[in-house]
Swiss-Prot record:
Protein's membrane topology: Single-pass membrane protein
Lineage: Bacteria, Bacillati, Cyanobacteriota, Cyanophyceae, Synechococcales
Gene name as annotated: psaM
Record protein name field: Photosystem I reaction center subunit XII
Family: Belongs to the PsaM family.
GO biological process entries: photosynthesis
Keywords: Membrane, Photosynthesis, Photosystem I, Thylakoid, Transmembrane, Transmembrane helix
Length: 34
């Protein structure tokens, strides 16, 4: 069960990175438009 836990942590990390990237892109677009 240890490998599954590590995989879950990796997936959660990727999701967090994806959300951070989307937020950064949104902020960049909003700043560029203004």
């Amino acid at each position: 069960m240890e490998p599954s836990q590590s995989i879950n942590l990796i997936i959660l990390g990727l999701i967090v990175v994806m959300h951070a990237g989307v937020l950064a892109l949104r902020l960049g677009i909003s700043l560029a438009r203004t």
